[in-house]
Amino acid sequence: MNMMTVKQQGVWAALLWPYLLTASIPLDCKEEQGSLSRCPSISQEKLLDRVIQHAELIYRVSEESCSMFEEMFVPFPLRLQRNQAGYACITKALPIPSSKSEIQQISDTWLLHSVLMLVQSWIEPLVYLQTTLDRYDNAPDMLLNKTKWVSDKLISLEQGVVVLIRKMLDEGMLTATYNEQGLFQYDAQPDMLESVMRDYTLLSCFKKDAHKMEIFLKLLKCRQTDKYNCA
């Protein structure tokens, strides 16, 4: 990618970023006391549409963030190393369906639970990522802002998915418990190269999982509208 292309992308990103920050419809659905309500004013179908919209935006911004980090901090020979065993994704151990046959066999509710597990597994690592990126001498504000935006929207997405599961199951109360698995391990003071590769792995893996969230939610939408023609 030549320097002019990079600059052009930077200009467009700067122009569109304020719009992206305000374009998404908020998922927050709270009572005055701050607890999640059953959202009686919005249908399950519309809530799912909002959840999908959030997932689409999160994936898009995660893709932009990963590409920006890669261009700025990761030499080309090191870009393949994130696939090695030492840089495995933190969600690898989660019971998330991966093959097409597995996905086709699970229920709608388990699709949503899979999304919830992925969302909650990334909340803490993204907070950590904000802290570590802030220590880079030449990290652009655009990258820091995107990471903060995704972190905030992920919490909003979590709230929307929890409410959606409650609506589908008609449950009065549902709380999140997957975060207790402790999937993310901190290294006190990694050297600079190790820190770059770890952050690159986090961004790359999150982009991949954000895409899974979007795919699962869109599959759920398809099942509800055209059950027998969803791949």
From Swiss-Prot:
Tissue expression pattern: Pituitary gland.
Parts forming coiled coils: none
InterPro entries: 4_helix_cytokine-like_core, Somatotropin/Prolactin, Somatotropin_CS
Annotated localization: Secreted
Signal peptide as annotated in the record: 1-24
Glycosylation sites: N145
UniProt keyword annotation of Transcription regulation present: no
GO CC terms of this entry: extracellular space
GO terms of biological process kind: animal organ development; growth hormone receptor signaling pathway; positive regulation of growth; positive regulation of receptor signaling pathway via JAK-STAT; response to nutrient levels
Disulfide bonds: C29-C39, C89-C205, C222-C230
Keywords linked to the UniProt accession: Disulfide bond, Glycoprotein, Hormone, Secreted, Signal
Molecular function as annotated in GO: growth hormone activity; growth hormone receptor binding
Family assignment from sequence similarity: Belongs to the somatotropin/prolactin family.
Descriptive protein name: Somatolactin
